[in-house]
A protein has these predicted regions:
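Acidic catalytic patch
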Residues: 98-114
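Helix-adjacent hinge/juxtasegments
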Residues: 59-102
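Generic recognition of short, well-ordered alpha-helical interface segments
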Residues: 8, 15-18, 45, 78, ...
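A short, structure-level motif marking secondary-structure boundaries and short turns
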Residues: 4-6, 78-80, 122-125
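Short, contiguous alpha-helical
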Residues: 10-14, 18-24, 31-73, 111-166
Length: 166
């Protein structure tokens, strides 16, 4: 799916982010630093990682600047409220940068942190895929601690099965 309009992309991205926020909002405050295994991402690490890569990697590269990814450590934001605020702030800053792009800029090349040249619209699409990947991790981690989560698109698989013709 090629993206030819910045506004179209931003509209879609806001919908994707809304779905991500709904699941992030399910993280229990007291479990923000929980992980399923030592050395693996905590909930806070995942949220900080999504926020920092969006702002300092994807947005910077999209406007044809080098990545400035600072990692996902506690020094960026610690505790539930700070982590959520960090995500909101990084998203707002990213949107400001994305809005500086014109539709023609989507066809330009940018350089990824790995040194690959990629068309800007493809780079932005990979940001969406990256977010969906980590959203899936959050869903799985929440299921491991028995937290009920919202269906991604309004229906569960059981709802779809029930409403399907057989």
């Amino acid at each position: 799916m090629e993206t030819k309009s910045v506004e179209e992309f931003l509209d879609y991205f806001e919908k994707v982010r809304g779905r991500t926020r709904r699941v992030v909002d399910c993280i229990p405050r007291e479990r923000i630093d929980w992980t399923y295994r030592e050395g693996k991402f905590t909930f806070a690490d995942l949220v900080r990682h999504l926020a920092a890569t969006e702002r300092y990697m994807f947005a910077e590269n999209a406007v044809r600047r080098p990545s400035r990814y600072p990692g996902h450590g506690r020094e960026l934001a610690e505790g539930y409220d700070e982590v959520i605020q960090f995500m909101e702030r990084m998203h707002a800053e990213s949107l400001e940068l994305f809005r500086t792009l014109g539709d023609d800029d989507l066809q330009l090349k940018c350089t990824t942190p790995g040194g690959a040249e990629i068309t800007v619209w493809k780079w932005l699409r990979s940001m969406i895929e990256h977010e969906a990947h980590h959203r899936g991790q959050i869903y799985m981690m929440l299921s491991l601690i028995d937290v009920r989560t919202p269906p991604l698109y309004g229906l569960t698989s059981e709802d779809v099965l029930e409403r399907s013709q057989r």
